[in-house]
Every structure is written in C-alpha cells, then in structure tokens.
C-alpha cells in the first residue's frame, strides 16, 4: 500500500498545489488533507474533481484551520483511480 500512497500523493501534489496538505493511511482507509472543499472545488481542474469521485469519498471533517480530511476506501476504488490516470494518459 505504501507505493499506492506514494502514487496518490504524487498525483495530488502535482495537480492540487497549494490545496493539498497531506496523505496518510489508517487501516482500510486513506486520509487526504486538503484546503476547505468549497474553495478547492472552485479552483481545481475538473479532472482532479474526478479523482475524488473515484475515491468514493464517504465523509469529511472540517478542521479548525479551515482544512478538511477526506477519507476514502483503499481497496478496489484505488484500482479505479489508477485506471483513470492510466487511461487518461497522465
């Protein structure tokens, strides 16, 4: 899973600066910390929005410093994410 996290991090860091803050794994979930989602959705490219769709986000927690933690399943949904980037010639 570490290589999967590295790939996710590389994709998001490359495309979401300065919105991306961190990525980590907890058991069966991946945590992606980004700027407040209402701001990110207004400024990030449509293809990055699709990443979050593919991650099948199930919950968001707004933090005191105006960031949000997005948790997503790590299993089959990860394969869908990689397929999207490969098929998109990214």
What residue ranges belong to the model's regions?
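Helical scaffold of the NTase/Pol beta-like nucleotidyltransferase catalytic core
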Residues: 7-9
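Short beta-turn/strand-loop junction motif enriched in small, turn-promoting residues
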Residues: 18, 39, 56-57
């Amino acid at each position: 899973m570490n290589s999967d996290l590295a790939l996710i991090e590389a994709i998001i860091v490359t495309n979401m600066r300065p919105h991306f803050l961190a990525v980590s794994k907890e058991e069966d979930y991946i945590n992606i910390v980004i700027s407040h989602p209402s701001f990110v959705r207004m400024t990030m490219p449509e293809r990055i929005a699709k990443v979050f769709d593919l991650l099948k986000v199930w919950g968001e927690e707004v933090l005191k410093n105006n960031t949000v933690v997005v948790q997503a399943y790590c299993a089959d949904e990860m394969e869908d994410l990689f397929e999207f980037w490969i098929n998109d010639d990214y």
